[in-house]
């Protein structure tokens, strides 16, 4: 087993009408918790790390952990660079073995976004690395990234078509009403916009900001063509909440083997639910 490109995972998902969950990772415990569930449920998985994650724990260490777990659980997995904005940073990490990258130029005007993404695609494809890009812009907060509501905008279907044609990108993250983080009220998802994008764009579509979105909404986006579902905030909240509760009950506790396991178990329940929502269980052979 090995670290593979997301391209192969998403192509199968697109052909068979399900989505691959992409879970954000932060340390060894979060990687282990996610993969314990994915192994049990035989679900393909994408482990996504933001630039902030790779500042916290070195790429080489994350890559070694993922490679070891891939062998332990006898399953392929994808290690994905989430919301990276630097070409040079992506090049370095691809040379180190990563085979999936998101170059985020969504804050640039269309032409500049195209230019940036095309340059990354040209390099990454020479290394068998798949590339995701974003058109439109999600609001909210994720790690070091913060986008206010006034700066967020939805994806235009015809621009999406042109963007994919001009860049050769392997998958496209679309802005259809979700946001990073949690919601103060139920999000208004533009399903019609998603359907119109699907009609003119052939590559796999990606839903960012899926934390806290009602399950039935996520299922509907998958029916309309989403093949990768990103989850971050819900994982962190479950983990942190369980650890806080453990310390409230065990104020003198100090053994990370106990409180980390409590956090991991809480996170695993979120992972299990998202796999069921995505319909990705039993998609890889035992």
From Swiss-Prot:
Pathway: Carbohydrate metabolism; D-tagatose 6-phosphate degradation; D-glyceraldehyde 3-phosphate and glycerone phosphate from D-tagatose 6-phosphate: step 2/2. This is D-tagatose-1,6-bisphosphate aldolase subunit KbaY. Its EC number is 4.1.2.40. Signal peptide: none annotated. Homotetramer. Forms a complex with KbaZ. It comes from the Bacteria. Zn(2+) binds at residues 83, 180, 208. Catalytic subunit of the tagatose-1,6-bisphosphate aldolase KbaYZ, which catalyzes the reversible aldol condensation of dihydroxyacetone phosphate (DHAP or glycerone-phosphate) with glyceraldehyde 3-phosphate (G3P) to produce tagatose 1,6-bisphosphate (TBP). Requires KbaZ subunit for full activity and stability. It comes from Escherichia coli O127:H6 (strain E2348/69 / EPEC). Keywords: Lyase, Metal-binding, Zinc. It holds the Pfam family F_bP_aldolase. GO terms for cellular component: cytosol. Binds 1 zinc ion per subunit. It is an enzyme of class 4 (lyase). Its cofactor is Zn(2+). The active site is at 82 (proton donor). Dihydroxyacetone phosphate binds at residues 181, 209-211, 230-233. InterPro entries: Aldolase_TIM (IPR013785), Class_II_FBP_aldolase (IPR050246), FBA_II (IPR000771), TagBP_ald_KbaY (IPR023788), TagBP_ald_KbaY/GatY (IPR011288). Belongs to the class II fructose-bisphosphate aldolase family. TagBP aldolase KbaY subfamily. It catalyses: D-tagatofuranose 1,6-bisphosphate = D-glyceraldehyde 3-phosphate + dihydroxyacetone phosphate. One of its GO terms (biological process) is D-tagatose 6-phosphate catabolic process. One of its GO terms (molecular function) is zinc ion binding.
